[in-house]
Amino acid sequence: MEKNTASEDAFALSEATARDYLVLLKPRVMSLVVFTGLVGLVLAPGHMNPVLAVISILCIAVGAGASGALNMWYDADIDAVMKRTRKRPIPAGIIAPNQVLAFGLTLSAFSVMTLGLMVNWLAAALLAFTIFFYAVIYTMWLKRSTPQNIVIGGAAGAFPPMIGWAAATGEITWDSLVLFMIIFLWTPPHFWALSLFTTNDYEAARIPMMPNVKGELSTRRQALFYAVLMAPVGVLPWVMGFAGMFYGVVSTLLGLAFVYYAWRLWAADSQPQMLAAARKLFRFSLLYLAGIFAVLLFEALTFKLLAAFGVF
């Protein structure tokens, strides 16, 4: 991919606002990352200093934003082609690519060093690896080279609860790995459902998403496969004892519903039915992840508050 050099300075940088820089951070993605990171931090055993907890979450947020900025820098050519991304700051001519690169690298270094110096270096190392994985492994390599880009690249979005857990405990445990696996297995059906009704956009940008390379039927079959894998993994926090019965019931019901929506997508026998089913699965996938992590957070906060008041 060709990169602009001196000509980048011709951009109208003076017109860039704080909102434009906020867009570079991908705030919607950042909010999900912060939420799952917070759940990992609160769910972890023990008590963490509130100030250090806030610093940890802020560092996770800044690191996630840095990843988004680096992604927009490298993918500026793709963003200019796709309808849903062509108004981003670089293709819109608001911020120069070299400015975005500097912004992303600065935020990356700041978030990692702050987390390491103020909290612990294990959490900082996980954050650094997450930024590297998303910006380099996924964005620069996998995204443009294989239809399995989402499967492997999904690891980047699955690390935040592990980072939160490591910030609170200084450890990587099986419990935190389960949180990682839930998001990791959730990612393929979520994004493949999206790609099924945005196929033309990905085709125009020459991104080898599963529907464009392997076809719609294969994509639908694999979405169902990952949904079936994910559903029982989603129940593991209860099975392993670091979530309560309420979570067990909610995660089971939501997991079964997820499999049902994925099955409806696989079984669709016409294009209109397939597109409708893909949209429903995509929307429900958001509800699923938000739902189970919200219950985890609710239970963890409830148990810790009760313990603080000596109830048990």
From Swiss-Prot:
PROSITE patterns reported in the protein's UniProt record: UBIA
Gene Ontology CC terms, in alphabetical order: plasma membrane
Transmembrane segments: 29-49, 50-70, 90-110, 117-137, 150-170, 177-197, 223-243, 246-266, 292-312
Gene Ontology molecular functions: protoheme IX farnesyltransferase activity
Record field: catalytic activity: heme b + (2E,6E)-farnesyl diphosphate + H2O = Fe(II)-heme o + diphosphate
Compartment(s): Cell inner membrane
One GO term of the biological process aspect: heme O biosynthetic process
Miscellaneous field: Carbon 2 of the heme B porphyrin ring is defined according to the Fischer nomenclature.
Record function comment: Converts heme B (protoheme IX) to heme O by substitution of the vinyl group on carbon 2 of heme B porphyrin ring with a hydroxyethyl farnesyl side group.
Record's protein name: Protoheme IX farnesyltransferase
Organism in which the protein naturally occurs: Brucella ovis (strain ATCC 25840 / 63/290 / NCTC 10512)
Gene: ctaB
